[in-house]
Swiss-Prot record:
Belongs to the pentraxin family. Residues 1-19 form the signal peptide. Disulfide bonds join 55-114. The gene is Mptx1. This is Mucosal pentraxin. Its cofactor is Ca(2+). GO terms for biological process: innate immune response. GO terms for molecular function: complement component C1q complex binding; metal ion binding. Ca(2+) 2 binds at residues 155, 157, 167. The keyword Transmembrane helix does not apply. It is found in: Secreted. SUPFAM superfamilies: Concanavalin A-like lectins/glucanases. Residues 24-219 form the Pentraxin (PTX) domain. PROSITE patterns: PTX_2.
Length: 219
């Protein structure tokens, strides 16, 4: 009985295949190139954003372009998009406008990405593996829509769909957090815990296609 209660607390399956789970210590694995494998992340609250902070960890050995995090609304593609165009070249979109951050990377190392953006100044700040890659400006005064589809594993070319296998993510993603405010990234890079919109320790999500959940290999 005790084990059953604990299991119920850790994983609750909701209608339509949606799950709630403490994903601490686990990773989503996207084992192969696909246009059908992805995970929908469901925020605790749907709200418009004038500031946000996004942190996540990932591993891949892809050398082609791929999407890591895709946030679309019905009226705007690439409201928030984290996309790798080339090795070490990170394209960060807000409101379908991009800033590019470049860093030397080892092809076979996991990455810890933290980025924030504030509407008032338009400044986006990007950190990779605990080191700042600088600050750039985009979409000053913009408001990110709140009625969104949030997807990891694919890049949305329409609201919740129109995926291209050649932009799909192959590898592992874990410790995803999203906040509705700016967090100093020199603090956030130590941990990806506690997002008030998306929190990996209390995650609501839906797996689609060939996605596997396993204990994470890296911290």
């Amino acid at each position: 009985m005790e084990k059953l209660i604990v299991g119920t607390l850790l994983l609750t399956v909701l209608s339509g295949g949606i799950s709630q789970s403490d994903m601490d210590g686990k990773a989503f694995i996207f084992p192969q190139e696909s246009s059908t494998a992805y995970v929908s992340l469901i925020p605790r609250v749907k709200k418009s954003l004038q500031n946000f902070t996004l942190c996540l960890k990932a591993f891949t050995d892809l050398t082609r372009p791929y999407s890591i995090f895709s946030y679309n609304t019905k009226t705007q593609d690439n409201e928030i998009l984290l996309f790798v165009q080339n090795s070490g070249e990170y394209m960060f979109y807000v409101g379908n406008s991009a800033a590019i951050f470049k860093a030397p990377t080892s092809l076979y190392d996991p990455v810890h990405i933290c980025v924030n953006w504030e509407s008032a100044s338009g400044i986006a700040e990007f950190w990779l593996n605990g080191k700042p890659l600088g600050r750039k400006g985009l979409k000053k005064g913009y408001t990110v829509g709140g009625e969104a589809k949030i997807i990891i594993g694919q890049e949305q070319d329409s609201f919740g769909g129109n995926f291209d296998a050649k932009q799909s993510f192959v590898g592992e993603i874990w410790d995803v957090s999203l906040w509705d405010h700016v967090i100093p990234l020199e603090e956030a890079h130590d941990s990806c815990d506690g997002g008030n919109l998306i929190n990996f320790r209390a995650l609501t999500y839906e797996e689609n296609g060939y996605v596997v959940t396993k204990p994470k290999l890296w911290t």
